[in-house]
């Protein structure tokens, strides 16, 4: 018995075992979550069994390996308690599962989570794309009233055209975040081409815009990086670095308020939607009637504290249009109406904490802004098959914005003649290794 206790203690003290447990549950759940967005046949019973298995594995990881401070423990307990009340009040299990996935990612490398997410999405979506073109699974084609006669919107193996486009957007977003330092001009041109193809074949306007903005944001960031590295003369570097830090702060603030901003805009546009208002009606038509449907939801169901059961029937899985179609696409209004104002507040606070925790990671801030824009119209904010950014709350996510030797902190140093120069920390240490502690001091944080 003592031997088993020692083995157990030894096993639970190894953090790698906890990481392995997380990825076991993560992969099982993600596989079936992504599969459900495709036209591949899948069994509901098998999905439920895998769901239960992944919940057990992730809960085991939390109980055996995770250690919290008192404040974080209270916060985590509050998140679980709120999601459990939402489950009882509305009957929806997904908020509880979302919280479980986030909490179980504690101390797991964020980069590794994104890599596995990206690999699984590329593999499954790639197979679905090829299978749909070969006729193995159905390639759903829809005729849109906005398109010319004879023009079709294709789903390429997904349950709907916008789902395919959303997968492409989130895969590109993840890949750009992971491999930001390897991006070149042809990647940005390729992103614009993909944006055009998504518009032409899927007519997914939101994801077309988001993919284009993705290339634009990262290209601009790349230019700023290149500019800051181009010269190391003090009179130029100092000014450029200050400008770079100013933009960095702007991204940080915008990311922090982006979800509150876009959520508020969508709520009031929906609340005050009237057909007679030409401006709002134009917006409604541009986003295919989403304001009208959201207003119906607000007036019919209202906003509750802990959520309510709201039947929704959307497009997808078939080319037949349901007669009782009703679906709220905006993530903000979807969460607010279905899961309640308290859980909606928790989601907003979580992303605010992610922004604060990773405020040195400008690329993550840009990614969250793009996510906030996308979720204004799409409902994928809490959908793990699409959005992987929420894991940054508890996962190990250090700043990836700057590589070695490209820090924004400047140092001033004096040589033997009394002249001073400004340079990056690494450059100063390499130039004056014997005097770096004595003669170097930071002049710009």
Residue spans of the language-model regions?
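Long extracytoplasmic/lumenal interhelical loops at the membrane interface
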Residues: 279-339
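Helix-loop-helix junctions and helix-breaking kinks within/between transmembrane helices
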Residues: 36-47, 88-94, 161, 187-223, ...
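Interfacial loop-to-transmembrane-helix boundary motif in multi-pass membrane proteins
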Residues: 104-128
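Membrane-interface segments at transmembrane-helix junctions in multi-pass inner-membrane proteins
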Residues: 134-180, 205-206, 331-335
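Hydrophobic transmembrane alpha-helices and their immediate junctions
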Residues: 338-372, 404
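Hydrophobic alpha-helical segments of polytopic membrane proteins
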Residues: 70-81, 177-268, 356-357
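Transmembrane alpha-helices of multi-pass inner-membrane enzymes
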Residues: 368-372, 382-420, 445
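Transmembrane signal-anchor hairpin modules in multi-pass inner-membrane enzymes, especially those
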Residues: 1-80, 178-181, 230-240, 403-445
